[in-house]
């Protein structure tokens, strides 16, 4: 028997979300998108546009351009940055996360990250299976964070407009 469905709060105004997904390790990263879309719909985020970029490094520029259009009330980024043995992958990951934070602070459009950087990732079926499951969990978590933040911002902006905050 399934547990009763949870009724999530509804938004006062329609929300439109951009989901920017890196194609590097697509079979892993797309699990976040699939889980996000399902959870987002349950949370009344029904307008989601999906954009693909080659890798995680390309996500911040796309996020910034999308934020500047003012079409989107939120942007979600998903990618996998792994140690390929040549470059210091944590520098790439750090740069991407800082750039995403800069985008949201400059544009006041919230940006959520499901860009993950495991300490170890080996191209074995065991690691692929683990990270597919992990990205599915992160997809749900980022949908929860997105919906809750948008509800909070909607409330806060209403209070600011009313002179309460």
From Swiss-Prot:
Q: Which domain of life is it from?
A: Bacteria
| InterPro entries per record | LS, LS/RS, LS/RS_sf
Please name the pathway.
Answer: Cofactor biosynthesis; riboflavin biosynthesis; riboflavin from 2-hydroxy-3-oxobutyl phosphate and 5-amino-6-(D-ribitylamino)uracil: step 1/2
GO terms (molecular function) for this protein are: 6,7-dimethyl-8-ribityllumazine synthase activity
Residues that bind 5-amino-6-(D-ribitylamino)uracil: 24, 56-58, 80-82, 113
Q: Name one GO biological process term.
A: riboflavin biosynthetic process
Report the active site residues: 88
A GO cellular component term found in this entry reads: cytoplasm
The positions annotated for binding (2S)-2-hydroxy-3-oxobutyl phosphate are: 127
This enzyme catalyses: (2S)-2-hydroxy-3-oxobutyl phosphate + 5-amino-6-(D-ribitylamino)uracil = 6,7-dimethyl-8-(1-D-ribityl)lumazine + phosphate + 2 H2O + H(+)
Any idea what this protein is called?
A: 6,7-dimethyl-8-ribityllumazine synthase 2
Query: What organism is recorded for this protein?
Result: Bradyrhizobium diazoefficiens (strain JCM 10833 / BCRC 13528 / IAM 13628 / NBRC 14792 / USDA 110)
């Amino acid at each position: 028997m399934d547990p009763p469905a949870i009724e999530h709060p509804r938004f006062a105004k329609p929300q439109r979300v951009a989901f920017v997904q890196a194609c590097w390790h697509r079979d892993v990263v797309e699990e976040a998108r699939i889980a996000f879309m399902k959870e987002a719909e349950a949370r009344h985020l029904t307008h989601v546009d999906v954009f693909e970029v080659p890798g995680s490094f390309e996500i911040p520029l796309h996020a910034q351009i999308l934020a500047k259009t003012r079409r989107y009330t939120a942007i979600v980024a998903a990618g996998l940055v792994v140690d390929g043995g040549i470059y210091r992958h944590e520098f790439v990951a750090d740069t991407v996360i800082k750039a995403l934070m800069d985008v949201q602070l400059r544009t006041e459009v919230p940006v959520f990250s499901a860009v993950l950087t495991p300490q170890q990732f080996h191209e074995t079926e065991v690691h692929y299976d683990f990270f597919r499951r992990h990205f599915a969990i992160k997809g749900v978590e980022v949908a929860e964070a997105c919906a809750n933040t948008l509800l909070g911002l909607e409330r806060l902006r209403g209070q600011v407009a009313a002179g309460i905050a």
